[in-house]
């Protein structure tokens, strides 16, 4: 899951980025309001963590512009503004959730997962395809009921494909979902991850659509 984080507090921002990255999220972090606002137009983010008190542009104005321009990515407001009227205003401007500081990182992760379930119309964290089960919240994968060991990028790729079962995902989109701007990406990175997953799940689990990208095979 690729997350856009807009937070000007260096200690908080670094803690969120580091912690979520260890949990398997890909996080792009911006400290300036306007830069963060423009970033959403440049990459396919799954969700946004947005502070309200930002240099350059207030978080409420950022959110208002996004919604007016049709950006529908789920937004979690994370702020020290805890007054009832502030929370109500944020939600009415188009935020999908509102969490006040101080916070526990595990709750931030849980709320992001809940936003993704809501976006995808899912009632449970568990994703299933054939005899493969994936629980992104618990970072658990099983094959025919047996534990499956996956590297972080393999887990992220499998989650992406399972969340989009029935769709062909272009290679470029997969690359953008798996990697942040500050990560080096080799030209065959996606192909390598697909190869490793096929070795663990079976050669037919992921199907190549030549000239386009990848999709899950038949169940």
From Swiss-Prot:
<keyword id="KW-0804">Transcription</keyword>
<feature type="DNA-binding region" description="OmpR/PhoB-type">
    <location>
        <begin position="124"/>
        <end position="218"/>
    </location>
</feature>
<keyword id="KW-0963">Cytoplasm</keyword>
<dbReference type="InterPro" id="IPR011006">
    <property type="entry name" value="CheY-like_superfamily"/>
</dbReference>
<keyword id="KW-0597">Phosphoprotein</keyword>
<dbReference type="Pfam" id="PF00486">
    <property type="entry name" value="Trans_reg_C"/>
</dbReference>
<keyword id="KW-0010">Activator</keyword>
<feature type="domain" description="Response regulatory">
    <location>
        <begin position="2"/>
        <end position="116"/>
    </location>
</feature>
<keyword id="KW-0805">Transcription regulation</keyword>
<dbReference type="GO" id="GO:0006355">
    <property type="term" value="P:regulation of DNA-templated transcription"/>
</dbReference>
<feature type="modified residue" description="4-aspartylphosphate">
    <location>
        <position position="51"/>
    </location>
</feature>
<dbReference type="InterPro" id="IPR001867">
    <property type="entry name" value="OmpR/PhoB-type_DNA-bd"/>
</dbReference>
<dbReference type="InterPro" id="IPR039420">
    <property type="entry name" value="WalR-like"/>
</dbReference>
<dbReference type="InterPro" id="IPR001789">
    <property type="entry name" value="Sig_transdc_resp-reg_receiver"/>
</dbReference>
<keyword id="KW-0238">DNA-binding</keyword>
<dbReference type="GO" id="GO:0032993">
    <property type="term" value="C:protein-DNA complex"/>
</dbReference>
<comment type="function">
    <text>Member of a two-component regulatory system QseB/QseC. Activates the flagella regulon by activating transcription of FlhDC. Currently it is not known whether this effect is direct or not.</text>
</comment>
<dbReference type="GO" id="GO:0000156">
    <property type="term" value="F:phosphorelay response regulator activity"/>
</dbReference>
<dbReference type="InterPro" id="IPR036388">
    <property type="entry name" value="WH-like_DNA-bd_sf"/>
</dbReference>
<keyword id="KW-0902">Two-component regulatory system</keyword>
<dbReference type="GO" id="GO:0005829">
    <property type="term" value="C:cytosol"/>
</dbReference>
<dbReference type="Pfam" id="PF00072">
    <property type="entry name" value="Response_reg"/>
</dbReference>
<dbReference type="GO" id="GO:0000976">
    <property type="term" value="F:transcription cis-regulatory region binding"/>
</dbReference>
<protein>
    <recommendedName>
        <fullName>Transcriptional regulatory protein QseB</fullName>
    </recommendedName>
</protein>
